[in-house]
Amino acid sequence: MGKLGNWWKTLLAGGAGVAALAAVNASIQRRALEPDDSALGGEAKLFAWKYGQIFYKEAGLDNPGLPIVFIHGIGAGVSSFMWRKNFDDLAQDFRVLAFDLLGFGFSDKPPAAPYSADLYVELISDFIREVAGGRANIVASSLGASYAVRVADEHPELVNAMILNAPAGYDTMNTRPGMAGAAFYGLLQSPVLGTSFYNVMASERSIRDYARHTLFYDYRRVTSRLVAHLYATSHQPGAQHAIAAFMSGYLNCDMSAAFARLVQPMVLVSGKQDVSTPVAKMMALLNLNPRARLEVFDFCRVMPEQEHPEKFNALASEWFKQQTYTDQRAERAGTKYRVAGE
């Protein structure tokens, strides 16, 4: 009975531990506030996609020319909120649309969706076709920029010109997950242990520290409002599913070959002090395609659109107006598409 008694004690202790973790997870979920959806102006709308409702904001409907579609990156709490310092400003001259990727922000977060780079490439393509009018300019960041590159390569008729902020998938985040990734994904999707791991990773302290040390050069830009929004968004029901796929490697996107083939005019944007996607990597990527140019923002890490919004918005406005003029000139010449400089 001694060994049997010890086994039962261990089992009961383990069960109590799991129950305690479950209680903590439930408490965190209850305390999470609703994220703020008013950071971007315009009208809130829903796009009924095959895997769920996609939330987006739209403004500048009366402005002429092609629309700008904003595509955010991947991370806990990340959403179209990240474009709050750009959306309204550019809406003065352009029709602008910013949407939350499936699994993020206010979009649906189905647990059984096949979260992957392919899924997001398909979502972006469908959004441009069915919501943006069939052709658009794109502003995208990180892995979102990599997905945009694939869209522009696979469906060139959908994309006119792009601004790509530190696209991932060049020499990192470019491999498919193996058995270890699949096993890790299974662990992260477990109701108790996976949720507990996620809650630690997406705690207010973790979010604040990551933003201060990795995302922003000036830590003072990591405001309490920003941290509160990222935390609230990251703890909406189902928010862990897409992040589990990301951390397991399922959202990785090898975009080098696609980038080299692109015919659309594009600007690469990089923060001079960015350590995750340094300028040297952007220079190497630039060498793959002579149609691209590079703009480097000093005193900046990953978030030039937030650290230097005036400069970023001026760049975007000038660039897309230039490409719209080039496109209209090409149409008058009798060609449907034309690349600037040709």
Predicted feature locations:
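Alpha/beta-hydrolase fold catalytic core
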Residues: 1-68, 92-94, 134, 320-342
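Conserved HGGG/HGGXW glycine-rich cap/lid loop of the alpha/beta-hydrolase fold
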Residues: 58-106
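Active-site loop/oxyanion-hole signature of alpha/beta-hydrolase fold enzymes
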Residues: 84, 88, 97-139, 305, ...
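Conserved hydrolase catalytic core segment
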Residues: 133-177
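Conserved alpha/beta-hydrolase catalytic His-Asp/Glu region
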Residues: 174-178, 199-260
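Short beta-strand/loop motif that positions the catalytic acidic residue
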Residues: 262, 268-270
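Acidic catalytic loop of the alpha/beta-hydrolase fold
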Residues: 272-277, 302
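Catalytic active-site module of serine/aspartate enzymes centered on a nucleophile-bearing elbow/loop
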Residues: 290-342
